[in-house]
Amino acid sequence: MAKEKEHMNLAFIGHVDHGKSTLVGHLLLQAGAIAEQQLAEGEDKFRFVMDRLSEERERGVTIDLAHAKFETDKYEFTIVDCPGHRDFVKNMITGASQADAAVLVVAVDDGVMPQTKEHVFLSRTLGINQLIVAINKMDLVNYDEEKFNALKDEVAALIKTVGYKPSDVEFIPLSAFEGDNITSKSENTPWYKGKTLVEALDDLEAPEKPVDLPLRIPIQDVYSITGVGTVPVGRVETGVLKKGENVIFEPAGVSGEVKSIEMHHEMIEQAEPGDNIGFNVRGVGKNDIRRGDVAGHLDNPPKVAKEFTAQIVVLQHPGVITVGYTPVFHCHTAQVACTFLELVQKMNPATGQVEEENPDFLKTGNAAVVKVKPTKPLVIEKIKDIPHMGRFAIRDMGQTVAAGMCIDLVPAK
């Protein structure tokens, strides 16, 4: 049997009209993931792919990529939702679709837009460390090298402000609509000596499994299975779980020995990051643990925060955020209301520069450092210790109002 290709999650980011859907459609088409006859005739033929599952068809704004998959020589890619989709941020943060890399799409005729900056900042905040820049719609400027270079310099300066190294990033002139430089080199850009998009995707580095970090398994569900007992189910985020080890669930505070681990209905001796498992722990009953608890080893238990300091970006809030605001924080599988205790600093979201100390309020578009207090026990970790356990989305009124990461915490015990 051929060795399975390594898997990568890929996000497409950038301003809403810059051609992300068309690019993804063309990529899937050229990579053979979609049959030609599925495409409708006419101007937006590629977008069809993206539109199939979108209720936003009427508005002419799509974005539900529905986890489309395609393969390159080296990887199997899953395209995770693009920003613009309402649950994008929540999905990325809660781990359903943490992206390993992103393609930033910027239209050459339009240049860097505010949304371009926001998405770049957000990608960095969400821990996407690898970036490819697709300078799209080159057909609209007659494949002009000078226009490409001018925009390349502008985007390079932008991504540098948030900590990407432009020298490590491929900048590719392409046309999503015409298909230039997606899977094969285009004759329209003889001046371009770099990689095609697919070559750049193949040159991404595979994400390393975080096996050396402390064990963390956020619990998704708890089942009672006849003859086995209580079986918590969850995905191993970090570390390794072995049969016979002692684990503790926090904030529940119960612990016991792991009697069995199963994945895909087969018993396994150990589980690694990315594995979705069910496991049975001696002495832990169904009513002792619940969704949102996190399993770890007894000698390095998950941290329960009495309060924590976070860096957040306010994405969409109809009013202002002040001290005392108590929305729901979605962190791994937990959902806990948390109260804003202090607004420490307001920052420029495109540069991270501090604009104001102790602001009175925050509004849409602001980035900030804040102190918050969970209204009931919550496991969260510092982003620098265990990045997978340090991100969260803030939801209120049925929408994601902000996203952020924990930069410091006061333990509850």
UniProtKB/Swiss-Prot annotation:
Region named G1: 14-21
Record SUPFAM superfamilies: EF-Tu/eEF-1alpha/eIF2-gamma C-terminal domain, P-loop containing nucleoside triphosphate hydrolases, Translation proteins
Location of the region described as G4 in the Swiss-Prot/TrEMBL record: 136-139
Entry keyword set: Cytoplasm, Elongation factor, GTP-binding, Hydrolase, Magnesium, Metal-binding, Nucleotide-binding, Protein biosynthesis
Signal sequence range: none
Segments forming domain tr-type G: 5-211
Family per similarity comment: Belongs to the TRAFAC class translation factor GTPase superfamily. Classic translation factor GTPase family. EF-Tu/EF-1A subfamily.
Protein name in the entry: Elongation factor 1-alpha
Gene name linked to the record: tuf
